[in-house]
């Protein structure tokens, strides 16, 4: 309100001063003698200045909320690279073909549930010298209640491990020896035919030929 009153007062004083100065200037021009031939035009009185509009009150500025200080960013620690152990390429080349067999072996072991809790299955899996996988052999091992029973009871071989010796008659032996004289390494087809003739399995015929070759080799080395 004080600012508005001051503005009104200044505008009124300024207006009166302008009007008085303009009237004084008109009187001086009219009273002065001009020697020139051109008539002096009368100066029109100055129109009063319009009053200045009052300045609108400035709205109060809202108080600015204090800004919280920004927390400093912690430096990110570098991640240590994970070191992968080196694999021997030769060993890795042998392990690649064995992956399906190992998976099948573990799946089969999960499915097997022993009926007798006193019987444990011992799986024997070996690798041959050339890197091939040997078929695992399941052996049953009975848990003994005392160590004395282990010493007294000898271990017996299962029927699968026992080698059955097959005795051949003279006629069957003559058939195999006649073929051996012709070819001591018969093909699978010939072994099947011989097995049908003598009433044996092809595997038994193959074992007979192997034993016969081994026996002849030993006799030859002994004579030399």
UniProtKB/Swiss-Prot annotation:
GO terms for biological process: regulation of transcription by RNA polymerase II. SUPFAM superfamilies: Homeodomain-like (SSF46689). Residues 161-220 bind DNA. GO terms for molecular function: RNA polymerase II cis-regulatory region sequence-specific DNA binding. The keyword DNA-binding applies. The keyword Transcription regulation applies. Keywords: DNA-binding, Homeobox, Host nucleus, Transcription, Transcription regulation. It comes from the Viruses. SMART domains: HOX (SM00389). It is found in: Host nucleus. One of its GO terms (cellular component) is host cell nucleus. Residues 139-162 are annotated as: Disordered. InterPro entries: HD, Homeobox_DNA-bind_prot, Homeodomain-like_sf, HTH_motif. PANTHER family: HOMEOBOX DOMAIN-CONTAINING PROTEIN, HOMEOBOX PROTEIN HHEX. This is Putative homeobox protein R749. The lineage of its organism: Viruses, Varidnaviria, Bamfordvirae, Nucleocytoviricota, Megaviricetes.
């Amino acid at each position: 309100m004080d600012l508005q009153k001051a503005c009104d007062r200044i505008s009124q004083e300024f207006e009166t001063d302008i009007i008085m100065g303009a009237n004084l200037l008109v009187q001086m021009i009219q009273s002065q003698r001009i020697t020139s031939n051109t008539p002096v035009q009368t100066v029109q009185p100055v129109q009063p200045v319009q009053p200045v509009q009052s300045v609108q009150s400035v709205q109060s500025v809202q108080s600015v909320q204090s800004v919280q200080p920004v927390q400093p960013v912690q430096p990110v620690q570098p991640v240590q690279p994970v070191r992968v152990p080196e694999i021997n390429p030769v060993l890795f080349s042998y392990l690649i073909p064995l992956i399906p067999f190992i998976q099948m072996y573990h799946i089969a072991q999960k499915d097997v549930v022993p009926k007798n809790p006193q019987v444990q299955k011992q799986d024997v899996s070996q690798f041959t010298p050339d890197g091939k996988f040997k078929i695992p052999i399941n052996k049953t091992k009975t848990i003994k209640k005392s160590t004395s029973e282990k010493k007294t009871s000898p271990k017996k071989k299962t029927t699968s491990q026992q080698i059955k010796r097959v005795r051949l008659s003279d006629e069957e032996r003559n058939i195999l020896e006649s073929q051996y004289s012709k070819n001591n390494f018969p093909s699978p087809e010939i072994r099947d035919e011989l097995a049908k003739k003598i009433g044996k399995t092809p595997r038994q015929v193959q074992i007979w030929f192997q034993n016969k070759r081994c026996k002849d080799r030993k006799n030859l080395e002994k004579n030399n």
